[in-house]
């Protein structure tokens, strides 16, 4: 839960500042490098401003992706793995889709993958 919270907090903060999409794991060029300019060179002494907080995603290790003003992340809800679509700027849940049962193992429960956005389609596989 903490991992998802801090990951979303980080991406929500970053994507509030930049305009580019990050439509899949490791970004648009599959290399983990943002081509955006004008980014902060250091965090403010009080840390980054929290843009929004989501407590409805549950557990998991999914990396969020951002495309077209929407943030997609996988988590758990009602005993199932879910794909959550949220407004990137405000965090409002737009929709959810059930992916299947929750993966339970010795390495931590919940989904591990990241969704991929291609045009107007979103692809996601559960853990």
Model-derived regions, located:
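Sec-dependent N-terminal signal peptides
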Residues: 4-13
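Noncatalytic, solvent-exposed loop/strand surfaces
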Residues: 19-127
């Amino acid at each position: 839960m903490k991992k998802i919270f801090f990951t979303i907090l980080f991406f929500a903060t970053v994507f509030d500042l930049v305009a580019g999409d990050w439509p899949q794991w490791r970004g648009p060029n599959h290399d983990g490098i943002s081509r955006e300019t004008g980014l902060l060179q250091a965090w403010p002494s009080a840390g980054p401003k929290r843009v929004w907080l989501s407590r409805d995603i549950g557990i998991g290790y999914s990396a969020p992706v951002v495309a077209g003003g929407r943030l997609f992340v996988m988590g758990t809800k009602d005993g199932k793995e879910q794909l959550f679509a949220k407004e990137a700027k405000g965090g409002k849940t737009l929709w959810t889709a059930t992916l299947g049962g929750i993966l339970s193992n010795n390495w931590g429960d919940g989904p591990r993958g990241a969704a991929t956005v291609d045009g107007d389609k979103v692809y996601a596989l559960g853990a």
